[in-house]
Every structure is written in structure tokens, then in C-alpha cells.
Amino acid sequence: MKIHEYQGKEILRKFGVAVPRGKPAFSVDEAVKVAEELGGPVWVVKAQIHAGGRGKGGGVKVAKSIEQVREYANQILGMQLVTHQTGPEGQKVNRLMIEEGADIKQELYVSLVVDRISQKIVLMGSSEGGMDIEEVAEKHPELIHKVIVEPSTGLLDAQADDLAAKIGVPAASIPQARAILQGLYKAFWETDASLAEINPLNVSGDGKVIALDAKFNFDSNALFRHPEIVAYRDLDEEDPAEIEASKFDLAYISLDGNIGCLVNGAGLAMATMDTIKLFGGEPANFLDVGGGATTEKVTEAFKLMLKNPDLKAILVNIFGGIMRCDVIAEGVIAGSKAVNLNVPLVVRMKGTNEDLGKKMLADSGLPIISADSMEEAAQKVVAAAAGK
């Protein structure tokens, strides 16, 4: 789960991390009111969307008068903001953050992630803040410094000081940087975050260290422990299809292709998508119905996939372990009839009650294309999507 910048800064503030004064605004008049409350002479008007690259896309403006705050708020609020993370369709801006201006001298980067290779929490830092860290990592990996943090000890003073020095924090400002890094770690740990990022971390002309941005991602499996984080959820920023899928306990992620995938098990789902791509196709979605799929869930899964206007074919790939193939067959038949399926459907089933499931499909009268192997299924669905 992602949250907005202003929400991330609320979290940082709770953990003692220095951030500029600012508030969210949901209208132009409210933006002006916030600016007047903060006082001048400089304000930053920021679009609030769940994507990076807002500045390059025109979603961050520096205002030097209340009139400019109104002008920029009017420009940004409601705009379709396109960044390298939104895709060409962009994301509509429904919220702003109005913040006091900052004396920017040195922009740094710091973040915390869970490293899958070491299975540890890793603190990363770079002297190249205020830009795309992915680009820095690709072109200048030597500028990315990493510290492995042991959960039993937390981020030690020496570790924080060492990283701060390596990324260029002046010696006199290292105690401030240490407090920010340790506060960021505590926020990451105590909220079950999967990412906590400050970009940029600013060192001002007088040596003050302050977080000018905040980005958090949270482990959705841990949200039951954090109702205060769930309260930050903004459904306007999420894919409507993914929201609908969650109501039926379906793991669904929209993709850019034209071949729908309905699979049981995340591993098999990823292997299915890889095999489709191997034979020249493009998956339209990741969809895991899980081990306890019912006829209703399968029907809803079909409805979700068919809402995609680019859909050209569907592949159902089932391994019947806990899940019985006859139950899936029943759902496929009911779902196909309920939605008046009008795209080619390829079905491959193996495992528990496989023969019964195949017989049910064969007797259904539906134009279902059967396959015995995953490779055969992928080849057939790619051909069907291409109209062959």
C-alpha cells in the first residue's frame, strides 16, 4: 500500500524527523488559506499522487507570492499529471500539499528497504539526491552506499554517522543526520513498511538537515496491525479493477498486454505469464484465484478480465492440488455464460478431478480450446489473441 507525501511526512514527524511545515489542500481556496497560515515569502505547491517524477512533469511549483500560490494551485489541481512512473495516461491530481520554502544547498538521498538476497533491512544513501535514484544506480553504482541493519540492534550511531559522512553530510551536521536516519529506521520498522525513502534530504546553507520529501510503501499483509496506516489509503490512486478484485479475495494486477490470465497460485501465475511472453504474447493481468476458489470467485475473475477493452483472449491454467479441477470447470462454465464470453478461451487443467473437469468443459457446449501442457496452452492463446 502506498501513501501520499504529506502523509509520509506526518509519520516522519511522529518519529522525530525534521520536515518543513506544510498541510494538504483539496481546493484552490484551501491552498491559499494554508499558504497564508504558513506565512511567506516562499511556498512550494506540490501535486499529491502515488508516483515519483512530479517535478519534471510540472507537478511541483515554487511560489513567491500568494497570487502565485493561487495560480499554481489552479494549474495543478485536477491536471492529468504524467511522469515516468504513471505511464502515458498520467494520474489525475486531486490533492495538493502547500509547504514552506527551503534553503536548498545540498540534496542527498536515503532510503530503507528489505533486501531479498541478504534477507536483511538495508539502509541506502547517496550524494546524488533530488533525482531518479534508479538512474544513479545504473550509471554510477559507486555513488550508492549501503548499510545492513540488524533488527536486534537497530541502526547504530556509528552506522548512521558513517553513512552520513559517505554521502557528504558536513561534519557539523552529522548529529542531525544521525537523528533523521535513526528516526527513519524506527518509522520503517514500527509501521511494517517495505520502503521508506527521503529524496531529497536537504542540507541548508546554515547546516540544517531536513527531509524535503517522503515516500512510504507498506506490506499489505501487515496492515491488520496498523489501522492508522489503513486510514491513509486513497482509493482514487488505485486501479479500480484491483480494488474490485480485493472484495473477492482475488490477487489481481493490471498489465499492458491483451491476454487475460486466470491461474491458481502466485508461482504458477508468474510462470504462466513468462511462458506467454516466451511465445510472443503479452499478459493483460496477473490473477491468482488462490487455493480456495469458488464458482463465484471464478465468475468475478472473468468479469474483471473482460472489463479490459484490450483483451483478445483468456488463458485458464490450473493445477489441482487443494483446488479441484471440477470446481474450476464449474466456475469457468458459469463465468463464461454469465458474461457472454466473446473472446477465445484456452483452458489447461492438471491434478485433482482433472478428468471430471475436462468432461464438464467438453459437455458444456462452449467453444473452449483445451491444452494438455503449459507450453501448448501458451502457444494456443497467443495464436488466438492474434486472430490465427
UniProtKB/Swiss-Prot annotation:
It catalyses: succinate + ATP + CoA = succinyl-CoA + ADP + phosphate; GTP + succinate + CoA = succinyl-CoA + GDP + phosphate. Residues 9-244 form the ATP-grasp domain. Its EC number is 6.2.1.5. Pathway: Carbohydrate metabolism; tricarboxylic acid cycle; succinate from succinyl-CoA (ligase route): step 1/1. Substrate binds at N264, G321, I322, M323. Keywords: ATP-binding, Ligase, Magnesium, Metal-binding, Nucleotide-binding, Tricarboxylic acid cycle. GO terms for cellular component: cytosol; succinate-CoA ligase complex. Its cofactor is Mg(2+). It holds the Pfam family ATP-grasp_2. ATP binds at K46, G53, R54, G55, E99, A102, E107. Belongs to the succinate/malate CoA ligase beta subunit family. Heterotetramer of two alpha and two beta subunits. This is Succinate--CoA ligase [ADP-forming] subunit beta. It comes from Burkholderia ambifaria (strain MC40-6).
